[in-house]
């Protein structure tokens, strides 16, 4: 997306998340003139977008020539001259197929951005821990576990794993509703 890598030709885009990032990437690549093949291990492309958004996005991508293949996982990527040889494995049957493309792009989510949480953890009065039983019971899950520390700390959203904004807000609501 930064424009530092100039992709052209045939691009195999593997989407492990089924959300916006891979589809935006497919759009950018198609607009650059690439032939894009979107691959998903899931039963449906863009399964996390919901029916309203996915219908519009998939229509727009299809009109740009993007093709979609489901139930496929990447088994191997090997260099073949200046191209890539990609072995796909069908997730239900185990059958493999080999494809040669110019580029492979893999969307597998983000690495948690949890450095601030870990920096603050020892200074919090709950050591960054939440009471899972209390949270399940709909009670305040933030409980001090030591006298030291002047604040309660919880980790949520992208500090845990790649999440969409709705999941992060739901985390925050469940954890903070009783504060």
Language model regions located:
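Glycine-rich dinucleotide-binding loop and its adjacent helix/turn
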Residues: 1-33, 121-164
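A Rossmann-like FAD-binding core segment of flavoenzymes
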Residues: 7-8, 31-135
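Conserved active-site and cofactor/substrate-binding residues in soluble primary-metabolism enzymes
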Residues: 20, 24, 52, 56, ...
């Amino acid at each position: 997306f930064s424009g530092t890598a100039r992709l052209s030709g045939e691009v195999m885009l593997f989407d492990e998340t089924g959300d916006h990032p891979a589809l935006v990437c497919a759009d950018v690549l198609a607009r650059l003139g690439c032939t894009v093949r979107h691959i998903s291990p899931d039963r449906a492309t863009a399964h996390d977008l919901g029916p309203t958004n996915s219908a519009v996005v998939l229509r727009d991508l299809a009109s740009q020539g993007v093709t979609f293949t489901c139930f496929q996982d990447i088994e191997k990527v090997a260099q073949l001259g200046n191209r890539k040889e990609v072995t796909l494995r069908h997730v239900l049957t185990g059958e493999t197929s080999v494809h040669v493309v110019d580029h492979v792009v893999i969307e597998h989510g983000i690495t948690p951005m949890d450095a601030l949480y870990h920096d603050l953890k020892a200074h919090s009065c709950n050591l960054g821990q939440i009471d899972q039983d209390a949270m399940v019971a709909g009670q305040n899950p933030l409980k001090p576990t030591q006298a030291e520390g002047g604040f309660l700390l919880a980790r949520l959203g992208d500090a845990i794993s790649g999440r969409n904004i709705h999941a992060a807000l739901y985390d925050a609501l469940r954890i903070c509703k009783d504060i």
